[in-house]
Regions:
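Intrinsically disordered, low-complexity terminal tails and linkers
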Residues: 1-109
Length: 109
């Protein structure tokens, strides 16, 4: 299911402007979401509210979010693709107005 997609723990120490970008092969339609969670390392199924960043429609090859202001706190970033059980390589880039305020680590499951 959806929550088996790659997830990353994101800790933000102070307010920042973020933009998320993913690139992959043109055969894979991708989406990126950043959801608030209560504690570092929680998976997206533990989200406390709606996503603060969502790239919306799945797009092939390259997806970029709008620049968004994000408050300090704990978040989970989830990279998903349109087709269930489809896997592939991707490059994720997180751009921040203050890179030292943002810490990212992969959630191993």
């Amino acid at each position: 299911g959806f929550f088996r997609n790659p997830q990353y723990s994101v800790q933000i120490a102070g307010p920042v402007t973020l933009q998320l970008r993913i690139s992959t092969t043109t055969t894979i339609a991708s989406n990126i979401m950043l959801v608030p969670v209560r504690a570092s390392g929680e998976t997206a199924d533990r989200a406390t509210s709606e996503p603060v960043i969502d790239t919306g429609k799945y797009r092939h090859g390259f997806v970029v979010s709008d620049k968004k202001s994000v408050k300090a706190g704990y978040y989970t970033l989830i990279v998903s693709n349109f087709h269930r059980d489809q896997t592939g390589l991707f490059t994720l880039k997180v751009m921040s107005s203050s890179p030292r305020q943002v810490k990212i680590s992969k959630i191993e499951r």
